[in-house]
Amino acid sequence: MNPYQYTASIKEFFSTDENYIIGFLTQSNAFDSRRTTIASWKEEINTLKKALINYRGENGFVAFEYTIPRVDGRIDCIIGLRGILFVLEFKTGETQDINVDKEQLMQYVTDLKNYHFESYDIPIAPMWVVPSADVPVARVIRPVTNENIFGLMCVSDSTISDVVKKVLTSEYANKIEIYANNWLHSPYCPTSNIVEAARKLYANHKVEDINRSDARGEDLIRTTNAIISLINQAKARNEKYLCMITGVPGAGKTLVGLSVATLHQNEEHTNRSVYLSGNRPLVMVLQEALARDARDRSKDELEKKLASIEDKKEKIVYKKAHKVNMTDIRSRIKQFIQPVPNWRKEYLKGILVSGEGEEASFVKDLNYQYKGEGEYYIPYDHVSIYDEAQRAWEAKENASYVRKKEKHLSNFPEWSEPRFLISCMDRHPDWAVYICLIGNGQDINHGEAGTVEWIRSIKHFDNWQTFAPSDILHDKEVAKEANGLKINFLDHLHLSTDLRSMRAENLAAFVDAILCMRIETAKGILPELDRYPIRITRDLKKAKRWVKVNARPSERYGALASSKGQRLKPEALVLLPANSSETEVIPWFLGDKSNVNSSFYMEDVATEFQVQGLEIDWAVVAWDADFRYSEEGWKQYQFRGSKWMNINKEEIRRYQINAYRVILTRARRGMVIYVPEGNNEDHTRKSEFYNSTYNFFKQIGIKEI
């Protein structure tokens, strides 16, 4: 099926009767063919002919109703001429600017530039066309970044030809030839951010619909299909599997987990999946984003239904009976996206400890009076998906927590969180699958057990089989623990490519080279990040201005820092607390530009604890004196009282390095690293604390703003 409704060369367009063109446009049921729409098409055709009258004999093409593949967007008109791609949005019969629609147009342009293969190197000129408006000739806003996207130009039918002429005579024209057939049928490679992806998955899209169509996207699809195949196999054979999925930051592990969870949400009870995460901010943001999206879709469906009801009384009754209830929506979503503590607490109910030490086990408390519905002892879900499973608690941390919180389990044995969670799924009499999504080098807090604990725990369950990529053996501790354990190695369970930074597949490697101080490696990778701008500055105002200028209207930007960066406060950068509440996290990620608590204000600074597993488009990464460059290696500090203290404990040092790994890989489109000048009058912010780090980044070759 063609992605457009009508296309022709410019020569053919001028020689074709407008009624013939409209006939093509009305043939498809996908578009409205009401009289008002036909009138709008006529006005668009006439305006387009006015714009191109001086180019009617040139090579070029036009296309109407171009559908952006898999993005649910449709562009009114495309013009390819003299190496320039014009993207036109018409507001026929209107004279008022509508900012929301303008943002949507710029989002379409950004999508084309980033995901549409044939548009990568083509200058794109977006035009907001109001044919009947009385507007002066628009100023042509030339591209200000290396993306080659002109600023939005607002035109009427009387000014469009002059604006087109200015663009076509600019220095950006005639540098590349646009072949109509190649462009119209170009591969499309979208990579949604995690919130957008979750929304689409919950709305019954498949992972193929929201992922890139190139080899890197196929990697994600293969992993998803491999997991689905294992689930079906476990069910068919009445077996129990532990499946481990590994991957670099941003490779799509969360996307795989959400895909599996949403795939089974409407199926019978025996196939239900639950998505779990110990990352509270991630859960809060996903739950709220999905709830808002579901509410909006429900309202749209209700309005459509009400429009079809003519009787006023019947309409009132129907509206009352089908009122959109946000509480109910949130409740449904929380059934399949849950924080780990909530799920764990549910299955700590009604159990008793039998035996002691290594002989300890759990049994059902036959005297327990369960007040809920259904079975409390056996998990409702046959498939459990633990995102960021490397952050599960070690034995002492888990046992201590349970003993304090659950009075009936004061004798809870020293079982790690992985061991207890697997034991819960082991209560199923038939089959079960536990899926661990593991981020390499992303354990960031005290008490987190790491990948090795899952290997150690599964040894206690002889009736379970383990599936994992051979990549897990790169960790020496894991390899040692896995010795003697039969693991079914499936390399499709490893995701090796960063999809978050869609213009920089080597970003993870670049960040790793920085943190490991492999300077020559970092220098070698940096030129490969030409489509992912990285800058450095010592001026916070410049840093904020840079992300604002680069960000498109629909893109999110914000400030990030390490949680140990406690002396950024004098720079008016306030770190969000590690245990942030919903009122802090949700506005930061989902609030719009009118919300002072949103990321856009760059006053509240998110740390690794808020952003791990999530992402923004552009980031100001504030680099404090907690992590200082020296020729001997990174010097690591934490702020205690009124001074910086050396971090000597290896575990804490690793957490801090991973914190910087997280914040340096959160931005999908680009970032600027802000290194303060310091203040020699403040003993906690001396210039010498910062200068070596700044010079290190300059040495690598990162450009200054």
What is the predicted function of each stretch?
Residues 253:
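Conserved lysine of the Walker
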Residues 1-190:
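Accessory nucleic-acid engagement/destabilization modules that flank
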Residues 194, 199-202, 209-241:
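N-terminal pre-P-loop "Q-motif" helix
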Residues 245:
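Hydrophobic anchor at the beta1->P-loop junction of P-loop NTPases
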Residues 430-433, 599-705:
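C-terminal accessory regions
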Residues 318-425, 603-607:
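Conserved RecA-like ASCE ATPase "motif II neighborhood" in helicase/translocase motors
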Residues 385-481:
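Signature of the SF2 helicase/ATPase Hel1-core->accessory helical subdomain module
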Residues 257, 444-448, 470-625, 629:
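Conserved helicase/translocase motor-coupling segment
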